[in-house]
Amino acid sequence: MPSYLLRSAIAALACAAAGAFAQQSPITISGAWVRATVPGQGGTGAFMTLQSPQALELVGASTPVAGVTQVHEMKLEGNTMRMQHLSALALPAHQSVTLTPGGNHIMLMDLKQPLAAGSTIPITLQLKDAAGAAITQTLQVPVLQQPPAGAAPAAAHGHHGS
């Protein structure tokens, strides 16, 4: 009987470990990059494509290279595109959501140093599932002058009046 209990305990631990691993990798991320900066530039953007097998919300992000990191959207107000903070960005199950220059993106503000092309920075995504449970995922993101080949194009800004 003790060996049965030991096997049951090992099986339970294996299931718990598998569940914990699933929580660590809730989304697939592709094409991630951060736009390089020049000395004196206070902010830049991070861009990527996100896909999740379950409905999630991107509720924030953080990085040690910026004093403030927020999820932003571009919104047309009258004839002007304006950037504004989003409290949550929906990531529908099994659908790709692309963060692009000129569209939804992660804004890095109050940069602590210039971000040189060729370097890599950590960004931690803050997510919530349908039950409200917090999930984080940290990735290493390359700093580039231009989008990588195959990255989604910048969002169209539309017609700005005549």
Residue ranges and their predicted role:
Residues 17-19:
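N-terminal signal peptide c-region/cleavage motif recognized by signal peptidases
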